[in-house]
Structures are given as structure tokens and as C-alpha cells.
A protein has these predicted regions:
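Small-residue-biased structural context
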Residues: 1-193
Length: 193
């Protein structure tokens, strides 16, 4: 059975590559490309469903809960900071999503909103991932017992099945591939089991 921390780190690699694609798309918009609402909506949907509901959901509902039980403070320190940043990320994704959901020609205000929120969200999430990979996850790995890890791996599977729905994870990986492919990303994404 896969180790829970390894699963989360694999998901980070997928998210990073979609962030690269979003950055590439935003750069083209900055250089004059017309905003495509459908494309923006697809980025927002992926970031909401995979990065937030699926990935942050497993962290918040399973990993962080256990760390708090083990004595990590919830309100401050690494867990508190990660929760705060998850909240910030949600606000940016909601604003990006609002542009995707709009109708008619994109207004200059919407274009500005897309650029502002994407330009703030991408570095926020990249730094966030770095902090988890280099600080919080290693701390967690030291504190979690083998029993914790087994329980967590099973809880992750149940979360994928019950919260996300059967086959949803695979569909989100396919969506990540499409987003990467459309923005010049040609390397195959890491295969997820």
C-alpha cells in the first residue's frame, strides 16, 4: 500500500505542472491573447476539484487532524499556516472561476481579475507545496507510527471513493494532462496508481 506522504507528494508534482500550464496561459493573455472562458473554467475546476477538494481535503480531514491529535497546534505553526494558505488559495480559485463562469465577451475588469488572481495564486501554491514537502511532511513522517500510516492510507482510499467518487481521481489526472498539453507541456505526467 502506498505511503500517505508519498501519495500527497505525487499529487504535488501534478499540481505544480498544472500551475506551470496556468502560468503559460496567463503569460499569453498578458501578451494579448483573448481570454477563453472555457479554458479558464477548466483550470479553475481542476484547481478546485483536485488541488483543493481532493488534495487539501486529504490533508485537512486526515493528515492534519492526526498531527493535531499528536500535539501539533492547529491555530499556528506549520499546520496553522498551511490551513491559512489553503483558505487564501480558495479565494483566488473562486475569483479565477468567476471569470470562467461569466458570459459574453470578457470585460477589461475580468481580464485584470484573472491576471491578478492567477499571478498571486501560482507563487502562493508553489511556495506552499515547498513548505509542505520540506518542512511539514518530514515532521509528519517522523511523528507518524506505522499504524498511523496504514490507517491513513486506508482513510485516503475511502476519501477518494466516498468524497471524490469512483474513478474521479483518474478523470482529474486526464484533465491535468489536457491542461498541460494545451499549454506546451509535452512530458508525460508521473503515472498515478
Amino acid at each position: 500500500m502506498s505511503q500517505p506522504i508519498d501519495i500527497l507528494m505525487e499529487e504535488h508534482r501534478v499540481i505544480e505542472r498544472v500551475l506551470d500550464a496556468l502560468e503559460g496561459y496567463v503569460t499569453r493573455v498578458e501578451h494579448g491573447e483573448t481570454v477563453d472562458r472555457g479554458r479558464v473554467a477548466e483550470f479553475a475546476a481542476f484547481l478546485r476539484d483536485f488541488a483543493d477538494t481532493c488534495h487539501h481535503g486529504k490533508e485537512e480531514e486526515i493528515l492534519f487532524k492526526r498531527l493535531v491529535e499528536l500535539g501539533f497546534p492547529r491555530e499556528h505553526g506549520p499546520v496553522g499556516m498551511m490551513l491559512f494558505e489553503h483558505g487564501l488559495g480558495r479565494e483566488h480559485v473562486a475569483a479565477i472561476g468567476a471569470v470562467g463562469q461569466g458570459s459574453g465577451p470578457v470585460t477589461p475588469q475580468e481580464r485584470q481579475s484573472l491576471l491578478k488572481h492567477a499571478r498571486e495564486y501560482v507563487p502562493l501554491l508553489r511556495q506552499h507545496i515547498l513548505k509542505e514537502d520540506r518542512v511539514l511532511y518530514p515532521m509528519a513522517a517522523q511523528r507518524l507510527s506505522a499504524e498511523d500510516r496504514d490507517r491513513m492510507a486506508k482513510a485516503f482510499e475511502a476519501f477518494e471513493r466516498d468524497v471524490m467518487g469512483e474513478g474521479r481521481h483518474h478523470a482529474l489526472h486526464e484533465q491535468a494532462h489536457r491542461l498541460m498539453a494545451a499549454d506546451g507541456e509535452t512530458r508525460p505526467a508521473p503515472h498515478h496508481h
